[in-house]
Swiss-Prot record:
This is UDP-N-acetylglucosamine 1-carboxyvinyltransferase. Pfam families: EPSP_synthase. It is found in: Cytoplasm. The modification 2-(S-cysteinyl)pyruvic acid O-phosphothioketal is found at C116. Pathway: Cell wall biogenesis; peptidoglycan biosynthesis.
Length: 416
């Protein structure tokens, strides 16, 4: 099992090109199921979750080629309408094939999902929405089985904001008969990116970027070309690493406007920031000031950046309160950060971080994707050697992280 070996050694300096967004790429790949034509995608990150999704699509009969950051999909020969447990258990996003399969083929069998161990992420909102659109759904033997001759437009109000739920129902609605209104829709940039691809494929969608999506169903969708948006979480992770190490870092290929809350918190911590159309520069002249925040749905502070800011706060001046409102169980990195010398206590869904002047290297274990990233940041500022076990979590969401960090001065390497 691979590990990272890190020696803390001063500031990160240089340039990093940010990869495409995992959380946009996965639904966009699944959208290829909606048409028999070819869909060509650029800026696709080379990640474990992307490779798992392509494996699942090929299993269904999809032709899928992955060359560099370009993926070419053709769904003309899709004939297996099932997502088996063996693949779904490793990646919750597999549920995203449900909507497209029911919409185009009238049937789908999808195993109940697995993935990160950070609490309940119920799929009941997906099921509720598809039922409102006329699908007959049963759950038996660990599978969701959905059937519909043709989905019918409906007004769907989800009980909570759900990103994958919005994406699944949005894809399903594109081929439904009549008008579908998705109320309380997720507004994340990755949802917007999916909607832009669907429009290129011939879908009729109003309200893109808002919490009310109106979809006028069409008979069929056609092929299209699309470039996946930059990964705002990868960008935020590298910015936190630069801030923690008192670095001077330029990120290329990013969209600063979808990172507003993260950039605001970095400024509050004392970072100097400059931005252009597709770049961000961060310089950190002194030890960070502790910053308090609470996670919430976009455009508020993203839960996927909570752990990385926890690592920054661990070595900041002062005390920060970090409140997690999206997922339960999302403080599993606290115990590992404390092994490195951090002073963090958890009270319910809030962590209190008392900044310390320095951390010291130790052996730690990654527990989920973003927790892994927080341990990398902590390792970069810790005295001595830090070894992070179970980095397979990290490989699910970061494209060649060690290579990108090494190129800007980090002493980090992958060991078996």
């Amino acid at each position: 099992m691979d590990k990272f070996q890190i020696h803390g050694n001063g500031p990160l300096k240089g340039e990093i090109r940010v990869s495409g967004a995992k959380n946009a790429a996965l639904p966009i790949l699944c959208a290829g199921l909606l048409t028999a034509d070819t869909v060509a995608l650029d800026n696709v990150p080379n990640l474990q979750d992307v490779r798992t999704t392509l494996k699942l699509l090929r299993l269904m009969g999809m032709q899928a080629e992955f060359d560099g950051a370009r993926v070419t999909l053709n769904g003309a020969d899709v004939n297996v309408l099932e997502a088996p447990y063996e693949l779904v258990k490793t990646m919750r996003a597999s549920i995203l094939v449900l909507g497209p399969l029911v919409a185009r083929f009238g049937e789908a069998r999808v195993s109940l999902p697995g993935g990160c161990g950070i609490g309940a992420r119920p799929v009941d909102q997906h099921i509720k929405g598809l039922q409102a659109m006329g699908a007959e759904i049963t759950i038996e033997h660990g599978f969701i089985h959905a059937r519909a001759k043709r989905l019918k437009g409906a007004r769907v109000v989800t009980d909570m904001i759900t990103v994958t739920g919005t994406e699944n129902l949005l894809m399903a609605a594109t081929l439904a008969e009549g008008e579908t209104v998705l109320e309380n829709a997720a507004r994340e940039p990755e949802v917007t990116d999916l909607a832009h691809l669907l429009v290129k494929m011939g879908a009729k969608i109003d309200g893109i970027g808002t919490d009310r999506l109106v979809v006028h169903g069409v008979e069929r969708l056609h092929g299209a070309s699309h470039s996946v948006i930059a990964d705002r979480i990868e960008a935020g992770t590298f910015l936190c690493a630069a801030a923690a190490t008192l670095g001077d870092l330029v990120l290329r290929g990013v969209q600063p406007d979808i990172l507003d809350t993260v950039l605001d918190k970095l400024r509050e911590a004392g970072a100097r920031l400059e931005t252009g159309d597709d770049w961000i520069r961060l310089a950190m002249p002194h030890r960070a000031k502790a910053v308090s925040f609470r996670t919430s749905e976009y455009p508020a502070f993203p839960t996927d950046m909570q752990a990385q800011f926890m690592a920054l706060n661990a070595v900041a001046e002062g005390t920060a309160r970090v409140t997690e409102t999206i997922f339960e169980n999302r403080f599993m990195h606290v115990q590992e950060l404390n092994r490195l010398g951090a002073d963090i206590t958890v009270e319910g869904n809030t962590a209190v971080v008392n900044g310390v002047p320095r951390l010291s290297g130790a052996n730690v274990m990654a527990t989920d994707l973003r927790a892994s990233a927080s341990l990398v940041i902590a390792g970069l500022v810790a005295d001595g050697e830090t070894v992070i076990d179970r980095i397979y979590h990290l490989d699910r969401g970061y494209d060649r992280m060690e290579d990108k960090l090494s190129a800007v001065g980090a002493k980090i390497r992958r060991i078996a």
